[in-house]
Every structure is written in structure tokens, then in C-alpha cells.
């Protein structure tokens, strides 16, 4: 009598993750920042406003992009996730136009306070959220056609022309929103997206296998700083917009639990234009 064949169940291998550079540095001198309270007292933020139970700023024109294997997260979080939304809403940009993440990224690296040695040309060397916001406040932002991300070409015109163009899209101010989740909801509901920093952990790395849900932050597994944006919230989650393409998370987005958001996001900034 023939013995029954022993069957083995094959495990489905997870696709290999793309290697990402994580180089967003903590912002310096945050104790000097204007705060949510300052914004409220100056009537930029509505401290006593009724906060809706949910808010979703996502829209079809605001597409997810991919920084690839570069260390440009600060450029993408500031130009593509924060400034672009505001300038489209204020009529300074059409829905089909992109801002240059490369300008925000390179200008931040060139002007940040991390100057023990020249590092603008070193891919893995990063910069901070606050430096990018200072670039946007002092110099402004340019469209991607002036300094394209994909080609790496330099601007061939005069510096005065470049910065005159950038000056058309300056921000007026930025505000440090701290780690108060109620203030975050208030800002998202009444003022727009928030740029945040986190140290990427294993939960973040697994977002493509959890439908984008970020439930529990694992500080023991962190491996470097990253800049992204909050673009909405529900009763128990914050909607996160990344720059790792649509294959990450839920088509480029993630949903951070309140506990995860409180533990993971070490900085949060909103702007006025």
C-alpha cells in the first residue's frame, strides 16, 4: 500500500522593501518657536473653535510621489505635502503644478546650522523641518520646472531671477504645534496640513502589510529620522502622507493610532501663507 505523500505548505514571501535613507535631524532651538498658543492669540488659529469628529484633506490632484533612494524627505514633506496644498488653496499654484522638493531640500542643507563640515553633496546627510520652513519664509519656493527633482540639472539662469521667482511663494509664518493631539486636530480642521518628524520604527516599515495601520510604536527598532505630513484625522487615527510612492502603506498613506502618533511624531509644524 502506497504511503500518502507528505505535503508541505509554502510560506508566501513578503516583497523586499526598497532601501530608504532616513536622515531627518531634530530641529534646533525649538524653544524659540512660535506656538499654537501664539497662533491662537494672534487669531491665526481658532483655539475655541468646534473641532469636527473627522477631517480628510486628501484630494485627487494632490498625488503621492516617491523620493526613491534619495535622502530628500524634508524637501518632499515641505514642498509637496505642506506648501503645495496651501499655495493651491490660495491661488498661487494650479492643481497641475508641482513645487520643487529639490530646492527645499538643497537649500535647507546649505543653510542649516549643521556646519561642522560641508555635506550638501552627501546623500545620507540630512537636515531639519525648521530649516526648510525658514527657507520657505525667507526665500519662498519655486516650481519643479525651475529645479527638477528627476533630472538633477542645475538652474541655468541668474540667481536674481531664481530668487525673484521664489519670493512669489513665501510663507508668512510657521508654528510649532508641539505634541498636543487636540491642537493637531484643531490645526488640521481649520488651518491645513501639518509637517511632522519621526524616527522610523518596525511598525512603519510594515505599513504595506497592515493596510497602512500604525498601531503600536516600537522605539527599540528605530533606525533614523523621516519627514512626512499629517493630512487629516478620524476619531482614533491621524492620516499620514508619505513620499515613498503608492506601494507603501495604503496607496502612500498610513493611519496612525493616537498612541502611535503621540509616541512617534517628535515635531509638528503648521504654516500660514
Predicted regions located by residue number:
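A generic signature of intrinsically disordered, low-complexity regions enriched in glycine/proline
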Residues: 27, 37, 41-42, 60-63, ...
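Predominantly the structural core of cysteine protease catalytic domains
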Residues: 2-5, 10-19, 25, 51-53, ...
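Active-site-proximal helix-loop elements at catalytic-domain edges
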Residues: 19-46
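Active-site-adjacent structural elements in enzyme catalytic domains
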Residues: 58-106, 120-138
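Active-site-adjacent bridging/hinge elements
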Residues: 46-58
Amino acid at each position: 500500500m502506497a504511503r500518502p505523500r507528505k505535503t508541505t505548505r509554502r510560506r508566501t514571501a513578503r516583497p523586499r522593501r526598497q532601501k530608504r535613507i532616513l536622515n531627518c535631524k531634530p530641529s534646533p532651538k525649538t524653544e524659540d518657536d512660535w506656538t499654537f498658543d501664539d497662533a491662537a492669540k494672534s487669531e491665526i488659529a481658532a483655539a475655541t473653535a468646534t473641532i469636527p469628529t473627522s477631517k480628510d484633506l486628501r484630494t485627487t490632484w494632490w498625488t503621492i510621489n516617491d523620493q526613491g533612494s534619495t535622502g530628500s524627505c524634508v524637501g518632499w514633506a515641505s514642498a509637496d505635502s505642506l506648501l503645495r496644498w496651501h499655495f493651491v488653496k490660495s491661488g498661487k499654484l494650479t492643481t497641475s503644478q508641482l513645487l520643487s522638493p529639490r530646492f527645499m531640500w538643497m537649500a535647507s542643507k546649505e543653510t542649516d546650522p549643521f556646519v561642522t563640515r560641508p555635506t550638501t553633496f552627501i546623500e545620507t546627510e540630512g537636515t531639519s523641518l525648521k530649516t526648510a520652513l525658514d527657507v520657505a519664509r525667507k526665500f519662498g519656493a519655486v516650481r519643479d520646472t525651475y529645479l527638477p527633482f528627476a533630472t538633477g540639472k542645475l538652474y541655468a539662469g541668474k540667481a536674481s531671477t531664481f530668487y525673484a521667482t521664489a519670493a512669489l511663494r513665501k510663507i508668512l509664518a510657521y508654528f510649532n504645534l508641539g505634541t498636543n493631539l487636540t491642537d493637531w486636530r484643531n490645526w488640521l480642521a481649520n488651518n491645513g496640513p501639518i509637517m511632522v518628524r519621526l524616527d522610523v520604527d518596525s511598525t512603519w516599515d510594515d505599513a504595506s502589510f497592515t493596510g497602512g495601520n500604525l498601531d503600536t510604536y516600537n522605539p527599540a527598532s528605530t533606525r533614523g529620522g523621516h519627514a512626512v505630513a499629517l493630512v487629516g484625522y478620524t476619531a482614533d487615527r491621524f492620516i499620514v502622507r508619505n513620499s515613498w510612492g503608492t506601494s507603501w502603506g495604503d496607496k502612500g498613506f498610513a493611519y496612525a493610532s493616537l498612541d502611535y502618533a503621540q509616541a512617534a511624531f517628535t515635531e509638528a509644524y503648521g504654516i500660514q501663507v
